[in-house]
């Protein structure tokens, strides 16, 4: 069974959002690369839960997205399409991290799928 392992919170003002979630929940952040994208650390590794990110919104209606870790992203894409889902962001490499794609389920909810692969380029 594959699990939700990451979330992304889009924000018009990422710094304000970081401050809010830090003050309310104690989350800490680290900027990832040169993009306006900050990894959010929500607790100690031994504590149940998932980490995520706060990112600058790319468009006004950008939804919050949860991502699911998969073992074989190409097989997952085929299953999504054959089960009535739609790929909305094609497969792309996150260099040194893995492979990522976004899909819409039959109800219109958007999720990410991620396959770890340190060799991704």
Predicted features and spans:
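A short linear hydrophobic-aromatic micro-motif
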Residues: 28, 52, 87-90
